[in-house]
Each structure stands twice: as C-alpha cells, then as structure tokens.
A protein has these predicted regions:
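Extreme N-terminal, non-catalytic leader segments
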Residues: 1-28
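P-loop (Walker A) phosphate-binding loop of NTP-binding proteins
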Residues: 33
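Conserved lysine of the Walker
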Residues: 38
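Hydrophobic positions on the alpha1 helix immediately C-terminal to the Walker A/P-loop
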Residues: 41
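Short beta-strand-centered segment that lines the nucleotide-binding/catalytic pocket of NTP-utilizing
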Residues: 51-65
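Conserved nucleotide-sensing/catalytic segment adjacent to the nucleotide-binding pocket
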Residues: 66-110, 121
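Small-molecule kinase domains that catalyze NTP-dependent phosphoryl transfer to phosphate-bearing small molecules
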Residues: 109, 113, 131, 161-199
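ATP-dependent NMP and nucleoside kinases share a basic, alpha-helical "lid"
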Residues: 109-158
Length: 199
C-alpha cells in the first residue's frame, strides 16, 4: 500500500535521493485525478530542482485520424503512450538527451521539435503517467487525489462552460483507468490536495 506524503516531504525525499548521485536519472511520475494538482506540483518541483526536465502526458495525444473506433469509451485510447515512452521517457531514464514533437489538440498539429538535455531528475506529469506501458522507465510513482466536492469546484473554475461535458466525458474515463490498473493502490506515495494550500 502507498504511503501518504505531503509535498515538503516529497521534496526532502527527492533531495536525499539526488544527493546520493545515482548513476541513472531519477524519474518521478505524477498521476492522479484531474484537478488534483499534478501540473501545479510538477511546476513546484521544477522550480525546487532546476537540474530537471518535465514531460507532460498532454503532449502525447493521438491525432483524431489515428484513434481507434470507440476511443471515447476506452481509457487512454486517445493517447500515444508508446511514443511518449520511446521518444521521451526511455531516453530521459537512460540519461540521454530527449527530442520529441508535442501534438497540440488545439492546433490539430504537431508542434516544432522540443530538445531537452539530460538531467538527474525527470518529472513526468499527467493522467496515465502510471500506465503499464511506461513500467520500467520510472523510479518513483506518486498519485495525487482530492475529495470529489473539491475536484468539482476546481474543475468548474477551470473549465467554465465546458465543465458539464468535461465531467461527463473525461472523468469517467480517468476513473475507469484508475480502477482497471489499480493506479492509486500501486503508487509509492499518495498526495491528498483537498485542503487549500497543500501545494
């Protein structure tokens, strides 16, 4: 079972691990419920550890033409996790430079190539970052969660008029993924961000 941890404790844990100068980069994967603060925590950690790179699962959506029929009902079917693993996560885990092109759903196109130098800390953040396809390229898995009421409040503030569609479409897919792969139960640590000011 995972242990509960607060962000300051996670920072201390990472600092201690990096102080040992491991031979391979430390890859921290932040998964969890939408609205739980994955991106916020990733940004906090990136500021705390400048010698790091951050990878976002949101950069690895599949173009609509490549998605399987019925993808809207299948968790993760709109993601290209194999490309994330092969082009970004595995090279970063092996201490190699990373080069990849993010796919922008807003623009409907791949963006210019992004090049990242090898760093001792790699932060992978976003939904599906604990997916079994990525097993073997991660050192530490942290699951973020918050109370349902707080999640609703945050998503309403974030999504505005798009909230109803977001809640009906994406939240069930995400919860299905958590249940199918026991994501919360198999994490190393859990961060509960329900209380304001947690991250």
């Amino acid at each position: 079972m995972p242990q509960n941890i607060a962000p300051p404790g996670l920072i201390s844990l990472l600092a201690a691990a990096l102080a040992q100068q491991p031979t391979k980069p430390l890859v921290l994967a932040l998964d969890g419920r939408c609205g739980s603060g994955k991106t916020t925590l990733a940004n906090t950690l990136a500021r705390q550890f400048p010698a790091s790179i951050t990878l976002h699962t949101d950069d690895f959506y599949q173009p609509p033409a490549q998605r399987i029929r019925g993808w809207e009902k299948t968790p993760c079917a709109n993601m290209d996790l194999a490309r994330l693993r092969d082009e970004a996560l595995r090279p970063a885990y092996e201490g190699q430079p990373v080069q990849y092109r993010a796919y922008s759903c807003r623009e409907g196109a791949y963006l210019p190539a992004r090049e990242l130098a090898a760093q001792p800390l790699v932060i992978l953040e976003g939904s599906y970052s604990h997916h079994p396809l990525l097993t073997g390229c991660e050192t530490l898995r942290v699951f973020l969660t918050c109370a349902k009421e707080e999640q609703t409040r945050r998503l309403q503030a974030r999504e505005g008029e798009r909230y109803a569609n977001f809640a009906a479409r994406w939240v069930p897919l995400e919860e299905g993924y958590f249940a199918q792969y026991h994501i919360a139960e198999t994490a190393d640590f859990v961060v509960d961000t329900t209380q304001s000011g947690t991250i």
